[in-house]
Structures are given as structure tokens and as C-alpha cells.
């Protein structure tokens, strides 16, 4: 996990979210108000969800569907960067 935090810090992201392993979750993972719920141990998934925490720290909650889609695309790009590293 320290590798994940170092990677995110290099992108000026210092998440404070709590990660909750939830084996019976329908989705792989999701972020909600400071908590990442996940059934995955894939660190790329964790990177993606923690990025959402940093987005919320910087900008607050998404104000509409367009902003939510923009943030999702950005988190996906960060996840791809992690996978390529």
C-alpha cells in the first residue's frame, strides 16, 4: 500500500479515505464520502478509488452528471498510469 500512496503523492494526491474490504459487494469497488468499498485486492482498482477521494478533497462533490463523468475518466487515466508503471 505504501507504493500506492507514494504513486498518488507524486501526482499531488494524498487520500485520507478508509478502505473497507467487502467480499459480497456487487461492484468491484466504489468510493462514497471518504470510504472506499471494494471486493478487489487489485491495487489499480484501489488507486482509481483513492483518486476519487483526492478529487473530492480538491473540488467537493460532483455537481452534475457531466462532472461525475469527467472525474470518472480522470480516475481511469490515473489507474492506467498505475498499471503502466
Describe every region a protein language model picked out.
Residues 55-66:
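Substrate-binding clefts and substrate-entry loops adjacent to catalytic sites
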Residues 28-29, 54, 73:
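Small/flexible residues
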Residues 1, 40-44, 65-72:
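Solvent-exposed, acidic/flexible segments
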Residues 1-40, 84:
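Auxiliary, metal-adjacent structural segments of Zn-dependent hydrolase domains
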Residues 44-57:
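Active-site recognition of the HExxH zinc-binding catalytic motif
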Residues 11-15, 65-85:
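Post-HExxH zinc-binding segment in Zn-dependent metallohydrolases
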Amino acid at each position: 500500500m505504501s507504493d500506492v500512496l507514494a504513486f498518488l503523492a507524486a501526482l499531488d494526491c494524498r487520500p485520507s479515505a478508509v478502505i473497507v474490504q467487502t467480499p459480497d459487494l456487487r461492484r468491484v469497488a466504489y468510493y462514497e464520502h471518504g470510504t472506499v468499498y471494494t471486493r478487489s485486492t487489485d491495487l489499480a482498482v484501489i488507486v482509481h478509488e483513492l483518486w476519487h477521494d483526492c478529487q473530492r478533497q480538491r473540488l467537493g462533490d460532483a455537481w452534475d452528471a457531466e462532472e461525475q463523468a469527467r472525474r470518472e475518466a480522470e480516475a481511469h487515466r490515473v489507474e492506467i498510469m498505475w498499471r503502466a508503471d
